[in-house]
Swiss-Prot record:
It is a single-pass membrane protein. This is Cytochrome b561 and DOMON domain-containing protein At5g48750. Disulfide bonds: none annotated. It comes from Arabidopsis thaliana (Mouse-ear cress). Residues 176-255 form the Cytochrome b561 domain. It is found in: Membrane. Residues 54-169 form the DOMON domain. The chain crosses the membrane at residues 216-236. DOMON domain could bind catecholamines. DOMON domain could bind one heme b. InterPro entries: AIR12_DOMON (IPR045265), Cyt_b561/ferric_Rdtase_TM (IPR006593), DOMON_domain (IPR005018), UCP037471 (IPR017214). Its main location: membrane. One of its GO terms (cellular component) is membrane. The keyword Transmembrane applies.
Length: 255
């Protein structure tokens, strides 16, 4: 009976030490990167970024000396009755002032429409209009529940960090662009993008910080009550029978 209990104790310690390793391995296996994507039109880009929300990816090629930025914003797992948008805000980190590229599929003809629109308020009509910088080769495609916008933009030379945002929403009757959702990831789809390194730096809101604190608190409780306390109790019960381990079992218990 004693040997069986001791075996259980050693097994629990073993699982506690190796569980994070198994978790990381599983996470790495299921993670999908934008590097493996091939475009149907044969386009190639030097860099790509897995955006943190809305099943989105940004592929781009940037020439710092000339300011030419060639992009492909790709939104996966999206219905054909939806619109997508990607934009850069040259003046702030928010929605107002964003210079956006939009696309949707015409409900009658089935052809894709891509155009530009400057956002000047919180309830924009997203009507077509010029941007504050030059845009060429604007197009879009929809295939296998995946919508993509292609464009080439010209920025001031030596621009390295930009504020960008991305979004999607429903397509209403008459191909009118409906309002995007006002909760969850739809309020988190904006970040700073370093065009040289490809690093995306998101801005966390107060609610996000509180959610993080709650998550950490729950994790600490689960580890303490589910792992440390049972190990301490078992150490105090079984290890103290060995005189050579005295007072090691006591220190394990109080830890």
């Amino acid at each position: 009976m004693f040997l069986s209990s001791r075996t259980i104790f050693v097994g629990l310690c073993f699982l506690f030490v190796l569980a994070p390793c198994f978790t990381r391995a599983t996470t790495n296996e299921v993670q999908v990167s934008c590097d493996s994507h091939n475009f149907n039109n044969g386009k190639h880009f030097r860099s790509c970024v897995d955006l943190p929300v809305l099943d989105s990816f940004l592929h781009y090629s940037y020439v710092r000396e000339t300011g030419v930025l060639e992009v492909a914003y790709r939104h996966t797992n999206i219905e054909s009755s939806s619109w997508i948008a990607w934009g850069i805000n040259p003046t702030s980190k928010g929605m107002i002032g964003a210079q956006t590229l939009l696309a949707y599929r015409n409900s009658t003809s089935g052809f894709m429409r891509a155009y530009t629109s400057s956002i000047n308020g919180y309830t924009p009509m997203l009507q077509e209009g010029p941007l504050s910088f030059r845009v060429t080769q604007l197009s879009a495609e929809y295939l296998n529940r995946e919508m993509t916008i292609f464009a080439t933009m010209v920025w001031p030379s030596n621009t390295t960090v930009v504020n960008h945002l991305w979004q999607d929403g429903p397509l209403k009757e008459g191909d009118r662009l409906g309002m995007h959702a006002m909760s969850g990831n739809h309020l988190k789809s904006m970040a700073n993008l370093d065009l040289l390194s490809g690093q995306v730096m998101t801005t966390k809101a107060a609610n996000d910080n509180m959610l993080l604190v709650k998550s950490i608190h729950g994790l600490v409780n689960a580890v303490c009550w589910g792992i440390f306390i049972p190990i301490g109790v078992m150490a105090a019960r079984y290890m103290r029978t060995y005189k050579g381990l005295d007072p090691t079992w006591f220190y394990i218990l109080i830890l």
